[in-house]
């Protein structure tokens, strides 16, 4: 079969979406610089008898005139209107369409109105079955893997389908998060609550094969199991000569000087941090109980003192937010 994977660009939506564009343009540039691993992972578990292509609309155009047997689309909520437009157009042309990703997983019945099938949650474990069902004319409306994929058994992503111009590549050493922050899709999805790790040697081996010199770790958080991360950092220091971007919890980092030291020695140049708010009341509102606002300054200073940057993520519009939040 001819298979096309599509990552939609919401700015191209004809019927809706945020036309102010700033957020979408930032996300789009991030995808060009450091593309998601969803489709490279699915390509890796696709039998070689099938032909796979990928289009990221942030920097590529979709050829709707080309014949595809299956079109796979993933989308977050801000991308979903454009995703539905793409799905509707391909279905009109006779292609089967599968939609997955955070929005479709949260609202599968809605997504099904625009697709022949919807994948709920992580897809690697059921992708082969889906393709087999499609070939045999038995494609189901919904696919859901009862158990989360075992990361030990998954192959490395097929990066051959990515744009060769990307400057930063992504790697994942773990999945899942045991915390239940109300705003986060990961901790509120069935498989997302199950924290899983890849063997360290799998991670370092994959990084060695990546040509880019800057690697962004796509883990939900690298401070959930700090002993694992420390072991990984030691291996990266010994075996790999590259730079890294990590993501973690600010208060865990504040208390763990050893982790900061080892991450810097491994080549980490930046920690991405979900501060979310400078109001403790707002953090309680969304169950972000791991963050302690009074420790923010101390933690940021510690990271800086170890020679690493801090990239902070914030949200605004909580019920308790006032103008002073800015």
Predicted regions and their residues:
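Conserved strand-to-helix beginnings and helix N-cap segments that scaffold or border functional pockets
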Residues: 65, 83-84, 124, 226-230, ...
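Alpha-helix N-cap/loop-to-helix initiation residues
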Residues: 35, 79-80, 104, 225, ...
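Radical SAM [4Fe-4S] cluster-binding motif and immediate context
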Residues: 152-311, 316-318
